Amino acid sequence: MFILLVKVQVKPELLDEFKSAILNNATLSVQRDPGCHRFDVLQQQDDPTKWVFYEVYDNEEAWVLHRSSAHFLAFKAVGDRALESRDVTKFTGINVKS
């Protein structure tokens, strides 16, 4: 599994627009993108400008395909204006079998 942990900080004046865009992107990613298994969106309780996304894909190729989707490109257009900072960390999922 290919996993992304994305941390962003959003400009306060664009929070509502950003929230709508990321929720649409996350929902459509899981529904439509082949190989996208999970897309969790978290907003920090004590600072609503800070967000974390937890994304799970079959492999990096599935993530690359996701980045060419119409819903991602629509989100990116908003994110490019709304984000103050972004940090992306890539992980390999390790499955523990009992």
Task: Describe these PLM feature segments.
Residues 2-8:
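Active-site-flanking beta-strand signature of metal-NTP-handling nucleotidyl enzymes
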Residues 14-18:
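Short, conserved charged micro-motifs
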Residues 24-36, 56-89:
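An amphipathic, aromatic/His-enriched active-site/gating alpha helix that lines ligand/cofactor pockets
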Residues 27-51:
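Short, glycine- and small/hydrophobic-rich beta-strand elements in well-ordered beta-sheets
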Residues 40-49, 75-98:
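Glycine-rich beta-strand-turn "strand-cap" elements at beta-sheet edges
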